Amino acid sequence: MYFIDEAINEIKAGNGGNGVVSFRKEKYVPLGGPDGGNGGKGGSIFFIGEQSENNLLKLKYQKHLKAKNGENGKNKNKHGANAENIYIKVPLGTIIYNLQNEITGEILKHGEILTIAKGGRGGKGNKSLATFKNPVPKYAEKGGIGESFKIKTELKILADVGLIGYPSVGKSTLISIISDAKPKIADYPFTTLKPYLGMVYVDNESFIVADLPGLIPNAHLGKGMGIKFLKHIERCRILIHMCDMSKSNPLQDIENLNQELKIYNKNLLKKPQIIIANKMDIIGAKTKLIELQKKILNKNIIPTSLLKNQNLKILKYKMLEMIKKNVVNLPLCENSSFKTYTLEEEKPDFVIKKDNQGFFVVKGEKIEKFFYKTDFNNEEATKKFAIFLKKIGVEEELIKKGVYFSKNKIKICDRVFEFIT
């Protein structure tokens, strides 16, 4: 199976069902009154965190995510059924962006639910619209429009420990020994083509280790697996830097790989590292280890031989110890663009601007909501919309801008109106 960690999807929540205009018609009930039911709510779309998911394959090949519309209301005060919501399981570490590359949400915990798009509210039938002043309304509301937009999703794997190193240093073998992960293992470069997650158990505690594909020089430029997998390192609490003691210069390999991390994101070097000096059963490895320990001060260096299971228990306890010391070392959305609204930033009810065609264009969140639930084929509903505009001051502002004298037309959403006093 391919490892997919990015996807772009078109999202469309369901529209609300329309309310209905209906009147009770029964024998011996001369004043039956309105009995039109409300429309059902449109389906919403949610992402839910699932720890067993490990990539975005479902989202990659399901380009369009569309929820159903709510049912229309019926007579005899019968309400339309709400549409079913859509719940999509995504792996932990999934980040959601809008097309402006602003982060709009992320999934970090198993079972965590994130609202992606809200369904439209159901329109009210004339039974619900009856008031003391208007006990027999001859209109009903249309259902609200469900949210619709494109999103980009990106997966940055959540793991306590990230295994890094050049190809064929033994990362996949290590994770298969110390955890329940079973990656494919062979003695040639780029064996690991996708990250593997394994659960490691130490006494009564456990933690997650990620086997990340091997890096090569200029990985930050996209060479080899490149940036595609460097980003997954950002979410690991600590790093296990594995080097091959059978190579001629293990120290140079360590320095080169750290340079790749630095160029990609200098904050990666701030993460705690354990250096595993692997293949200590090779002739000459002990001499190289002594040189390594002289050059790298204040570093946790653990010599191992996966062939002989040397020091693996010590390694597991050391990883657990460092994880506990670095509980807060999990970067979330460092470059997020969440918008914070204050009382000073409160938006006006509407704005009016003149476009190139000479139309007075009226915009406002409240106006748009009222517009989309109004049935303009119904005279009474249209009249109610006009009263609403007058009540919030649109008519007065239009007169100030000269619409009465210039006889310009007014545009609200996708509809053009004439100004009549």
Curated annotation (Swiss-Prot):
GO terms for biological process: ribosome biogenesis. Residues 342-421 form the OCT domain. GTP binds at residues 165-172, 190-194, 211-214, 278-281, 305-307. InterPro entries: G_OBG, GTP-bd, GTP-bd_Obg/CgtA, GTP-bd_prot_GTP1/OBG_C_sf, GTP1-OBG_CS, GTP1_OBG_dom, GTP1_OBG_dom_sf, OBG_GTPase. Keywords: Cytoplasm, GTP-binding, Hydrolase, Magnesium, Metal-binding, Nucleotide-binding. SUPFAM superfamilies: Obg GTP-binding protein C-terminal domain, Obg GTP-binding protein N-terminal domain, P-loop containing nucleoside triphosphate hydrolases. Its EC number is 3.6.5.-. It holds the Pfam family GTP1_OBG. CDD domains: Obg (cd01898). Its cofactor is Mg(2+). GO terms for molecular function: GTP binding; GTPase activity; magnesium ion binding. Mg(2+) binds at S172, T192. Residues 159-324 form the OBG-type G domain. It is found in: Cytoplasm. Residues 1-158 form the Obg domain. Transmembrane segments: none annotated. Gene3D superfamilies: GTP-binding protein OBG, C-terminal domain (3.30.300.350), GTP1/OBG domain (2.70.210.12), P-loop containing nucleotide triphosphate hydrolases (3.40.50.300). One of its GO terms (cellular component) is cytoplasm. An essential GTPase which binds GTP, GDP and possibly (p)ppGpp with moderate affinity, with high nucleotide exchange rates and a fairly low GTP hydrolysis rate. Plays a role in control of the cell cycle, stress response, ribosome biogenesis and in those bacteria that undergo differentiation, in morphogenesis control. Belongs to the TRAFAC class OBG-HflX-like GTPase superfamily. OBG GTPase family. Monomer. This is GTPase Obg.
